Regions:
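Short, positively charged, Gly/Tyr-enriched micro-motifs
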Residues: 1-82
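Short, surface-exposed beta-strand-loop junctions and turns on beta-sheet-rich folds
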Residues: 10, 141-144, 264
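Acidic/histidine-rich catalytic cores and adjacent linkers
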Residues: 21, 25, 121-132, 138, ...
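Short acidic, glycine/Ser/Thr-rich loop/turn "cap" segments at secondary-structure junctions
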Residues: 21, 33-37, 94-98, 174-178
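A structural signal for short coil/turn segments at secondary-structure junctions
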Residues: 42, 119-121, 141
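RNase H-like nuclease fold core
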Residues: 48-132, 136, 229, 250
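Conserved beta-strand -> loop -> alpha-helix junction used to position metal-binding or nucleic-acid-contacting
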Residues: 125-171
Length: 288
């Protein structure tokens, strides 16, 4: 703060204040310093720290040259109706589009696709976790189904230790997913079905409704999942020049790191929390 010798008024250096605010904000986000830590460092109150953080304006912009991109896309939720959709370029290790959302719907993915295309980006391939309908938002673009999520789907239907021999065999085939190719995997899946197709057709009577239903519903669902997703399980092998990952691990890992950093600052207001998330989405910038 400066005093004018002529009029005796005090003035603030706005640029200096702005730099100070940015420095405090980056320490708060990237160094995980709390209100108390920052108040102690700057010799001020925690209320002053909070007011300083609230002055910060974050821009939903990431700087990246227009270019063809491979996109890993998914939604994560911090609480009910408080979610975040992110498009990440795994080869660049950058988040290139995001939006806070209350739910996960196909039209939100379409919004992200249109935004990138409007700004001069070409999506060469998309990696998804297999949620129903999302692939339709990227019609005409090579789509890769995440191997980890496919294995989790099978595990959910068959459990970790299935008792039925048919389930055990199908689980063994699924376990080879990351170490095989489309031809071998397809042949194994067809051979499994030929062996167990009569078993899959077995029905039982429900005495309460007096209706017939399939006896091995979960096993049928597990097989149907593999059969439905088969055209998208080995896309990464068909386009080696694009370096398409076969999992969404790049984005899953970022989400885990994001939530870990946010949890340090529990009790954040929604507005302040969104500022922190946007700063983390844009990438690490250490304070000076």
């Amino acid at each position: 703060m400066y005093k004018c010798l002529r009029c005796s008024k005090y003035f603030q250096n706005k640029r200096r204040n702005s730099n100070l605010e940015q420095n405090i904000f980056k320490k708060y986000v990237w160094q995980r310093q709390t209100y108390t830590d920052l108040a102690s460092e700057y010799g001020r109150s925690t209320k002053w720290v909070q007011r300083t953080l609230d002055k910060i304006e974050t821009k939903n912009i990431v700087t990246i040259n227009r270019q063809p991109v491979v996109v890993v896309a998914d939604v994560t939720f911090f609480s009910r109706k408080n979610g975040l959709i992110v498009f990440r370029e795994p080869n660049l290790r950058k988040n290139i589009w995001w939006k806070f959302v209350p739910y996960e719907r196909v039209d939100i993915y379409e919004l992200g696709k249109k935004h990138l295309e409007k700004n001069g980006f070409t999506i060469q391939a998309i990696v998804l976790d297999g949620k129903p309908g999302v692939r339709h938002a990227f019609t005409g673009i090579p789509a890769q189904m995440c191997h980890f999520h496919q294995k989790q789907i099978i595990k959910r239907y068959l459990t970790s230790n299935p008792k039925l021999e048919a389930s055990q065999k199908l689980k063994e085939i699924t376990a080879t997913l990351t170490d095989t190719n489309e031809q071998i995997f397809t042949e194994q899946l067809i051979a499994w079905y030929e062996t167990w197709k009569d078993f899959l057709k077995e029905k039982t009577n429900n005495p309460e409704t007096n209706r017939w239903c399939y006896k091995h519903k979960k096993l049928r669902s597990a097989y149907r999942s593999l059969k439905t997703n088969l055209p998208y399980l080995f896309t990464y092998q068909k386009y080696p020049e694009l370096n398409i990952p076969n999992t969404t691990n790049s984005l899953d890992g970022f989400f885990n790191s994001l939530k870990s950093k946010i949890n340090v600052h529990r009790g954040l207001s929604r507005k302040r929390g969104m500022k922190v998330v946007v700063e983390l989405l844009k990438g690490k910038k250490l304070p000076k």
